[in-house]
Regions:
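A short helix-turn-beta junction within AAA+ P-loop NTPase domains corresponding to the substrate/partner-engaging
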Residues: 2, 101-120
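Conserved NTP-binding/hydrolysis module of P-loop NTPases
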Residues: 2-3, 12-30, 41-44
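A short beta-strand-to-loop transition that corresponds to the Sensor-1 phosphate-sensing loop
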Residues: 58, 89-96, 100, 148, ...
Length: 386
């Protein structure tokens, strides 16, 4: 038997009152202002061979004020071992769990059986869930929603990418941006500072520390501290020495397209906003997501995968297998791979003195015939859709 409880953001006494009210509505006998022990006794019931699972959602609200609930829960489970009850505590506040919870609960942490962080789902899972959508559409939607299946449920795969983005983010009744803003305000204390840094990084010309310093006016030391916090929350990552990117797709889209144009976003209709501020720049936005999808596939195939910067700001992957073989990987995206692309790759590899045993090209629209004749047998072409 599975029992669910979603904790509200209120005092411990109010939580006991509300949970007790829920239990009374289910026909249980419990006092109007029950203690935690009364609540747990009522939930677990009498001794039975039937196992029960209690799932408490948003459990961080139970602990941020004080740790009394956790103390009572641990004591109850130890004193009533005859009750077959498994308690699972869940929360979306992963940053608080990783950075603050242990210091908050102290030695009580030793009574927790384990921690499990649920990662975002890979692109391949999205393809399996939506097999009818084209590969191009899946890539463009994954670029915004990332690997969060809760957001995937909101998609209408029969509609275009533009129509989905307009409905989910740009219409007056769109709730997702406000949900994200609320989540950020709960995770980050000085939101004005963090918003400034995230907006700066989202403009991909300013991903370097010096560029952030020039644009924000914050000291390099201050920027470094806030970047460290953002990386701990897995919102930002260092992709190259001194170069940072927003790693959360949802937040990256918001700070790239919506945050810099607040007035127009709130004022204009969705389609007009898309045409003015998103359409022209969206392919560049998607290319970064495509690179991440390629990286995800490569990490499953090779021992090490490292992003390298070459001439003219071009980046490539250098992979090594378990035998030490070096493989250079270019990712052209959804366009046809040409002889010019291959020549640029060769020039870039020479500029950084990179000698490779093999070359892999990720492309979703094939390659020109002239290139096939020119490099016959030297290249391996792959698609993220396979």
């Amino acid at each position: 038997q599975t029992i669910r409880y979603t904790a509200p953001n209120c005092s411990s006494r109010e939580m006991c009152y509300q949970w007790g009210q829920e239990l009374r509505e289910q026909g249980k006998e419990i006092s109007r202002y029950p203690s935690w022990e009364e609540v747990l006794q009522c939930v677990s019931g009498e001794k039975s061979d039937r196992k029960k699972v209690l799932i408490i959602e948003n459990f961080h609200y139970l602990l941020k004020g004080d740790t009394f609930f956790l103390q009572e829960l641990i004591r109850y489970l130890k004193e009533h071992r005859e009750v077959s009850l498994l308690v699972i505590l869940t929360t979306y506040a992963s940053g608080w769990v990783e950075n603050s919870m242990i210091s908050k609960i102290g030695n009580l942490a030793f009574s927790v059986s384990g921690f499990l962080k649920v990662k975002e789902l890979p692109f391949s899972v999205m393809r399996r869930i939506f097999p009818g959508g084209t590969l191009q559409k899946s890539i463009e939607l994954y670029a915004v929603l990332g690997g969060m299946p809760g957001l995937w449920k909101l998609l209408e795969m029969s509609a275009s990418v533009e129509e989905n983005l307009t409905t989910l983010f740009l219409e007056k009744n769109s709730f997702l941006p406000e949900l994200m803003i609320k989540w950020l305000s709960e995770e980050l204390r000085e939101t004005a500072v963090y918003n400034t840094i995230l907006a700066t990084i989202a403009d991909e010309k300013n991903g370097k520390l010096n560029a952030m310093y020039a644009r924000t006016g914050f000291s390099r030391a201050k920027i470094s501290v806030y970047l460290k916090n953002l990386m701990e929350l897995e919102l930002v990552e260092k992709v190259l020495p001194g170069t940072y990117e927003i790693s959360n797709s949802f937040i990256r889209f918001y700070f790239r397209f919506l945050f810099p144009h607040q007035t127009a976003w709130r004022r204009d209709n969705g389609r007009a906003f898309y045409e003015t501020y998103i359409r022209e720049d969206y392919s560049s936005f998607v290319r970064t997501a495509y690179r991440r999808i390629c990286q995800e596939i490569l990490q499953a195939d090779f021992h090490t995968v490292e992003l390298k910067k070459a001439a003219q700001w071009r980046t490539y992957f250098l992979c090594k297998d378990t035998a030490g073989k070096k493989i250079a990987v270019d990712y052209s995206g959804t366009v046809c791979y040409t002889s010019e692309d291959y020549d640029a790759l060769q020039t870039a590899l020479k500029s950084i003195r990179m000698e490779t045993d093999e070359i892999i090209i990720f492309c979703e629209n094939g390659y020109e015939n002239a290139l096939a004749e020119k490099v016959s047998g030297k290249l391996q072409f792959r698609s993220v859709g396979v």
